[in-house]
Amino acid sequence: MASSQLEFNVERKQPELLGPAEPTPYELKELSDIDDQDGVRLFLTAIFIYPPPTKTSMPTRKTDPASDIRRGLSKAMVYYYPFAGRIREGPNRKLSVDCTGEGIVFCEADADIRLDGLGDVEVLRPPYPFIDKMTLGEGSAILGAPLVYVQVTRFACGGFIITGRFNHVMADAPGFTMFMKAAADLARGATVPMPLPVWERERYRSRVPPRVTFAHHEYMHVDDPPPRPTSEPWSLHSAFFTKADVATLRAQLPADLRKAATSFDIITACMWRCRVSALQYGPDEVVRLIVAVNSRTKFDPPLTGYYGNGLMLPAAVTEAGKLVGSDLGYAVELVREAKGKVTEEYVRSAADFLVLNGRVHFVVSNTFLVSDLRRLIDLANMDWGWGKAVSGGPVDVGENVISFLATSKNSAGEEGAVVPFCLPDSALGRFTSEVKKLVCFRPLENAAASNPDHGYMSRM
C-alpha cells in the first residue's frame, strides 16, 4: 500500500531528558566563528531506517532497539559531552555551549503497522509524508534548550526508524552522524568510539586582527537583484541519477573534463543549469552556486573526529544567460573551481569575513547550494546491534535553495544518487524538460515512487 494512502497511528511514550552515562566536565566552551553564522542558527533533522533484524543480525540478548539506542546515546555523551549542554549567547552575538550535563531529549514510540507499509524501505527518500509522526515536535529554540531530540519508533514487524533533530550550531550533518555512529558502536559493546571526537573549534575562529584574503561570494551580494515577489508555494521533490545517467552526462563533456570530473561535479552542474533555466532568470541576472566542501581534510594533519561545522561554502558566480546558453562543461568547470578554493587559509579568511560582517547569512537570492553527503553519512556502518540502516539521511533541505546528494536505490534496485530539491510548481515541468534533454530521455525518478502525493509523476 502506498504510504500516502495509509492511515496509521504512532503512540509516543513521555519524552525524557537523557544524560551522559558518567559525570562530564562542567565548563563553558566557545563555538567557532563558522558555527555561529546566521545560516546555521536552526535545527536539522536526520532519519535512519532499519528493517526487521535477520537471524544473523538479531541480538542474542533479550532487549529491544530503543533500550540499546538509549544506552548508546548516554554512553556517547560521555565523549561528546557538549551535546548534553545548552547554547548561550554573549556580546557581539558570540555563541558558546554551557556544558551542564543536562542531556538530550529521548522518546520511544510504537507504530501500529509494519515498516513495509510505508513502501520499499530501500527507496524511501524525501519528502517523507510520515515524518511528523516519527519526529519530536520540540526543538525550535536555539538558545537555552536541549541540543538534540531523538525518537525511536518501533514497527509491528520488528523494524524501526530513528530520527534525530539537532541544533546546527553544534554540528553539521557529518558531525551529527559521527555522534550517532559513536553511540551505535558503544551500544554494540565498543569500549571507546572511533574516531575519538575532538573539539578544536579554535581552528575555525577568526584571527586577531581579522584579514580577509579571499572574495567570499557566498556571503557577498554581487549585483544581486532584489528577491522576486511571489506567493507561489515551493514544493520538495527528489531526482534520482543512476550510474548510466552520469555516464550519459559525462559523455557530453570535453575530453579533459570527462576524465577529471567527479559524479558530484556532473550531477550538481546538471541540476544547477536545469534549475536556472526552469526559474527563467533574465539573461543578465547574476546566479550563484554554493558548494558545501568538507574542510576537515584541508588541515595538516586532517581534523579527524571534528564534529563542529566543517563544511565551507565556496561559490561560483555567473550570468544566467551564459550558464544556460553554454554546454554542460561550462557548469562543470564552475563547480570544480568553487570546490578548489577551499584550503586552510580559505577557512581562516571565511571566519574573518563573518566576524567583520556580523555573522551574516549566506546569500539566498538567485542561489543554489549543494552538498555531497554520500560518503559523509555512513549508513552502512550505523549498526546498533540490530543490523545496518538501509536508507536515511537529512529529512529535508531546510531552505528552498538547498540540496544535497545522498546514496539511494531506485525501484529497479539500481544504486545511484538521490537529490532532493525545491521548486515552484510552475517551474517543475520546465525543469523536467531540461533534465530530459541532458540525460537523453533516460528517466528521472522522484519521490513519487514511494510518496506519490508529494513527488512529481512526470517520467522523462
Curated annotation (Swiss-Prot):
Gene3D superfamilies: Chloramphenicol acetyltransferase-like domain
Tissue specificity comment: Confined to immature fruits perisperm. Also detectable in roots.
Alphabetized InterPro entries for the sequence: CAT-like_dom_sf, Plant_acyltransferase
Disulfide bonds: none
Active-site residues (renumbered): 168 (proton acceptor), 383 (proton acceptor)
Enzyme class: transferase
An annotated GO BP: piperine biosynthetic process
Transferase found in the keyword field: yes
Catalytic activity from the UniProt record: piperidine + (E,E)-piperoyl-CoA = piperine + CoA + H(+)
Cellular component GO terms held in the UniProt record: cytoplasm
EC number of the protein: 2.3.1.-, 2.3.1.145
Keyword Nucleotidyltransferase: no
Keyword vocabulary terms for this entry: Acyltransferase, Cytoplasm, Transferase
Region called Disordered, residue ranges: 1-23
Chief localization: cytoplasm
Localization: Cytoplasm
Chain location of the short sequence motif Microbody targeting signal per the record: 458-460
GO molecular function: piperidine N-piperoyltransferase activity
Assembly behavior: Monomer.
Family, per entry: Belongs to the plant acyltransferase family.
Function, in words: Involved in the biosynthesis of aromatic piperamides natural products such as piperine (1-piperoyl-piperidine), the pungent principle contributing, together with several terpenoids, to the aromatic properties of black pepper fruits, and displaying numerous pharmacological activities such as antiproliferative, antitumor, antiangiogenesis, antioxidant, antidiabetic, antiobesity, cardioprotective, antimicrobial, antiaging, and immunomodulatory effects.
Protein name: Piperamide synthase
Native species: Piper nigrum
